[in-house]
Amino acid sequence: MSTDVTQLAMALIARPSVTPLDEGCQTLMGKHLSAAGFTLEPMVFEDTTNLWARRGTQAPVFCFAGHTDVVPIGDLARWHTPPFEPTIIDGYLHGRGAADMKGSLAAMLVATERFVAKHPHHNGSIAYLITSDEEGPFINGTTRVIDTLEARNEKITWALVGEPSSTYKLGDVVKNGRRGSLTGNLTVNGVQGHVAYPHLADNPIHKAAPALTELAQMHWDNGNEFFPPTSFQIANINGGTGASNVIPGNLEVMFNFRYSTEVTADELIARVLGILDAHGLDYDISWVFNGLPFLTGDGPLLEATKSAIREVTGYDTDPQTTGGTSDGRFIAPTGAQVIELGPVNATIHKVNECVKIADLEQLALCYEKLLEKLLC
C-alpha cells in the first residue's frame, strides 16, 4: 500500500511542470505547509513561479530548498509508462521528476508534517524555498528569491537542497559543495574565401586550433582535499558554410570551466585572454558566470546530516563536491551552510525516470531526523 510520501510524490509527478512551468505543484505544497502553520509568500518573476514559506520568526532558520520544474520528457515512444502518469512497478515509482526532484519534495513535506506534529514549539524556524526555474535558465528562480530575502536581511542558517545526490543507494553520497561554473563564448574572426585561393582568405579554424589545443592541455590547478582540479571542456564548435570549397569567415567556440576554490573566475579569464592574445587571434568573447564554488565544511549541518543518514540507513555517507551545479550556489554566498541530500540519480533526465519507493520513505526519515537534531 502506498505511503503518504508516495501518494504525495505521485500527485506532484502528475502535474506536467516542464520548466519553467509549475502547473500547480507549489499550490499543492502550499496547502500542506499552510496546514502545518507556515506563512506563504508566493514570488512570481516573469515566467517563473517561486514560493517562500516560513514557520517561525526566530533564528536559526532551517530551509528546505528545491524545484518543481522538470526537464522535457524526450522521446515519448521510449517511455515504458506515460511520463506524467505516475506508475508503481516492482517497488519503483516511475514518472518524469520522480527522482529529480518531486520525490524529495514529497519527503520534505511529510518529514515537516511529522516533525511539527511532534514538536509544535520547536526552536528557530523552518522555511521552504521552492522554484520552477532550476532546470531552465535559472534567472528568475532561487537567485531572485535570495535577492529579495537579502534586501530585507532575512537569513537562512542551514539549507537542505533535495537534489538527487545518491549514487548507488540512498544517502551513500551527499554534496557538501559544488564547483564553480564559467562559460566562455568565443568568436574567432577570419576572412572568408575560396579554398583554392587561401592567400586571399584568412582561415579562423587554422588560426584558432593551436590556441584551443593549448587551452585543452593547460593544467589550471591541482584542486585540493575537497575539489578535483579545475576542468576545461570545449562544448561546441561551429564554423563554415557547409560547402567544401569555402574557407569560413569565423569560428564559434563555446567552452566551460568547472573550477575549484583554488582559482577565481577572474584568474581563469585572464589566463584565457593571455593565451588567445599570445596566438595573435582576432576575436570577440563573452562570459557567463553560472555560479561560484562553495563548500560546507565540518559544522552543525554536515554533522547532523551524517548522523541522520547513519541512524536511518546503518552506513556512513560520503560528502563530495563532484557533479553539476545546483541552486545551492545561490544560497551559499549568503553565509548559509548548504548540503544536498536526495535519491539515487541513476535515471535523472533520462526516459523512464524512476525512484525506489523504499528510498523515499527513508529519505523522509532522514529529513525528519535532521530537523530534530538542529531544531530541538
Swiss-Prot record:
* Binding positions for Zn(2+) 1 per the UniProt entry: H67, D100, E163
Q: What class of enzyme is it?
A: hydrolase
Residues spanning the signal sequence: none
This protein's cofactor list reads: Zn(2+); Co(2+)
Kindly state which keywords UniProt assigns to this record, in alphabetical order.
Answer: Amino-acid biosynthesis, Cobalt, Diaminopimelate biosynthesis, Hydrolase, Lysine biosynthesis, Metal-binding, Zinc
- Annotated active site residues, numbered on this chain, are D69, E134 (proton acceptor)
Q: InterPro entries in the record, alphabetically?
A: Bact_exopeptidase_dim_dom (IPR036264), DapE_proteobac (IPR005941), Peptidase_M20 (IPR002933), Peptidase_M20_dimer (IPR011650), Peptidase_M20A (IPR050072)
Q: Which residues bind Zn(2+) 2?
A: D100, E135, H349
SUPFAM superfamilies (alphabetical) = Bacterial exopeptidase dimerisation domain, Zn-dependent exopeptidases
Q: Which pathway or pathways does this protein act in?
A: Amino-acid biosynthesis; L-lysine biosynthesis via DAP pathway; LL-2,6-diaminopimelate from (S)-tetrahydrodipicolinate (succinylase route): step 3/3
Family annotation (HAMAP family)? DapE
E.C. designation(s): 3.5.1.18
Q: What is said about its interaction partners and assembly?
A: Homodimer.
Q: Does the UniProt entry include the keyword Transmembrane helix?
A: no
| Cofactor binding, per record | Binds 2 Zn(2+) or Co(2+) ions per subunit.
| A GO MF term | cobalt ion binding
Question: What's the protein called, per UniProt?
Answer: Succinyl-diaminopimelate desuccinylase
Known function = Catalyzes the hydrolysis of N-succinyl-L,L-diaminopimelic acid (SDAP), forming succinate and LL-2,6-diaminopimelate (DAP), an intermediate involved in the bacterial biosynthesis of lysine and meso-diaminopimelic acid, an essential component of bacterial cell walls.
PANTHER family from the entry? ACETYLORNITHINE DEACETYLASE, N-ACETYL-L-CITRULLINE DEACETYLASE
Q: Which GO terms describe its biological process?
A: diaminopimelate biosynthetic process; L-arginine biosynthetic process; lysine biosynthetic process via diaminopimelate
Query: Catalyzes what?
Result: N-succinyl-(2S,6S)-2,6-diaminopimelate + H2O = (2S,6S)-2,6-diaminopimelate + succinate
Assigned protein family? Belongs to the peptidase M20A family. DapE subfamily.
Pfam families of this UniProt entry? M20_dimer, Peptidase_M20
